[in-house]
Amino acid sequence: MLGGHSQAVLDLYLRRNGLGAGDVAKVEALAVPPVSLEQSLRQGRIDVAALTGIFQDKALAAGGVRRVFRDYDFLGAFTAGSYVFRDDFIERNPDTVRAFTTGIAKAIEWSRTTPREEVIARQTEILTARGRNEGPDALKYWKSWGVAGRGGLMTDREFATWSGWLKDVGQIKEVKVRPRDLYTNEFNPYANGGTPR
């Protein structure tokens, strides 16, 4: 089992293309580290790889493989991840949470309104300045942060998609939590039509 996003998207794709639960269960999903997926695919160790983002773009640019589907093809634009803080941390440090969230929100919007080449150049500067011996080669494939909402605003849909899937595949009997109880946009300066200062 792959777990997480890759497992859910694979299952959704198979089900939406006519496979029943019995057939889906016959698909052997293997967890392979993302950095090893392309090599495993090219060496024939696996038949299909759930390549995402830069890993996918790099593999496609090298040729010899093709994209079968993207989660966007059947889910549309959505944000698949989020930052989380513990409730007690938020209560003790609301200004810190607001500053962090504002910084992330502004960075998301800056990357959307700035020419791609400039964003990549800035990322390269940051990468180099960190001094961690990280190569910037993969940055040439960067497109976006994969965040749907303005400034990273979250919606119920980002959570309901997955809770519905968990119910459909029998991992839970009923959805007992409301998506709205899982997140807040309270600290995001773009909430309610706002803009950051």
Q: At which residue positions do the language-model features occur?
A:
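Residues that form or immediately flank small-molecule/cofactor binding pockets and catalytic motifs
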Residues: L2, P34, Y72-D73, F187
